[in-house]
């Protein structure tokens, strides 16, 4: 279990997060939603071990987070892929750093590429891929090291609406099949409501958790209900509008 308790943080000398607490249990997909500048990415960077909090505690399975680790796989908004490597060697990169044999890391990388729907693209270079395909490579690379926790920082924000929905479906399929703890950062309200088993809404910076919602739309998709049927369901629309109202309420507080 990931446990974040009483987290305070600064970014470039300014307060970014204020007394943030959350937990992610095994098999839970938690989405953090908030406007630009609310500290969402700072929160992810702290959990990933890329930054150190001003105060508070972060533990994964009761072990303090003190730096980056293969226990926490990260998928970045800009993918962070290596353009001089082909697809399969990008997926192998973390395994190579971990000292896995060439043969075993190739087997693992090919398995992950098949999982994300990129079988047959192993020897393409990154510049030959669409935005959605590059994000699939990023997800495959993160999954290859078999992390306990998967962290995604607005991974679908730059994609067109059709591709974004495909990637949301892929993520839910991976969540269903692996049972991993997942934390996703987004500013897209519909995406947040669709994916989250628990949704945390952050206030404008410095970010505080102002709303927590338990949702089941992602679980419904994982159990076989079509995405379009879920998103056109009056219950889904009502939840989406409720969250939208909360977001605008926070903006009005600032004004």
UniProtKB/Swiss-Prot annotation:
Domain (ABC transporter) spans: 2-229
Q: What is its EC number?
A: 7.6.2.7
Q: Name one Pfam family in it.
A: ABC_tran
Provide the reaction this enzyme catalyses. taurine(out) + ATP + H2O = taurine(in) + ADP + phosphate + H(+)
- Cellular component per GO, a single term: plasma membrane
Q: Which residues bind ATP?
A: 34-41
Query: What keywords tag this UniProt record?
Result: ATP-binding, Cell inner membrane, Cell membrane, Membrane, Nucleotide-binding, Translocase, Transport
Instruction: Give the molecular function GO annotations.
Output: ABC-type taurine transporter transporter activity; ATP binding; ATP hydrolysis activity
Task: Give the top-level enzyme category.
Answer: translocase
Topologically, how does it sit relative to the membrane? Peripheral membrane protein
Cross-referenced InterPro entries: AAA+_ATPase, ABC_transporter-like_ATP-bd, ABC_transporter-like_CS, ABC_transporter_ATP-bind, P-loop_NTPase
Q: Where in the cell is it found?
A: Cell inner membrane
Task: Indicate whether Chaperone appears among the record's keywords.
Answer: no
The answer to whether UniProt assigns keyword Disulfide bond to this entry is: no
SMART domains documented for this protein: AAA
Query: According to its UniProt entry, what is the function of this protein?
Result: Part of the ABC transporter complex TauABC involved in taurine import. Responsible for energy coupling to the transport system.
Which protein family is it in?
Belongs to the ABC transporter superfamily. Taurine importer (TC 3.A.1.17.1) family.
Q: How does it assemble?
A: The complex is composed of two ATP-binding proteins (TauB), two transmembrane proteins (TauC) and a solute-binding protein (TauA).
What name does the UniProt record give this protein? Taurine import ATP-binding protein TauB
Source organism of this protein record: Yersinia pseudotuberculosis serotype I (strain IP32953)
């Amino acid at each position: 279990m990931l446990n974040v308790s009483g987290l305070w943080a600064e970014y470039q000398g300014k307060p970014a997060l204020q007394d943030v607490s959350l937990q992610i249990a095994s098999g839970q997909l938690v989405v953090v939603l908030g406007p630009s500048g609310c500290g969402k990415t700072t929160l992810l960077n702290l959990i990933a071990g890329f930054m150190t909090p001003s105060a508070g505690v972060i533990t994964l399975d009761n072990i303090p987070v003190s730096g980056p680790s293969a226990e926490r796989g990260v998928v970045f908004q800009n993918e962070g892929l290596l353009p001089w490597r082909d697809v399969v060697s990008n997926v192998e990169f973390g395994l190579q750093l971990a000292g896995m044999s060439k043969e075993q890391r190739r087997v693992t990388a090919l398995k992950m590429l098949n999982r994300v729907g990129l079988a047959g693209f192993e020897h393409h270079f990154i510049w030959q891929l669409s935005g959605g395909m590059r994000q699939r490579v990023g997800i495959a690379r993160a999954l290859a090291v078999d992390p306990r926790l998967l962290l995604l920082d607005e991974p679908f924000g730059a994609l067109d609406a059709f591709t974004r929905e495909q990637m949301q479906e892929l993520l839910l399929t991976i969540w269903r099949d692996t049972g991993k703890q997942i934390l996703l950062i987004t500013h897209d309200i519909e995406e947040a409501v669709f994916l989250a088993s628990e949704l945390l809404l952050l206030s404008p910076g410095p970010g505080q958790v102002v709303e927590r919602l338990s949702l089941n739309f992602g679980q419904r998709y994982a159990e076989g209900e079509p995405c379009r049927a879920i998103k056109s369901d009056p219950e889904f629309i009502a939840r989406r509008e409720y969250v939208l109202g909360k977001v605008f309420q926070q903006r009005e507080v600032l004004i």
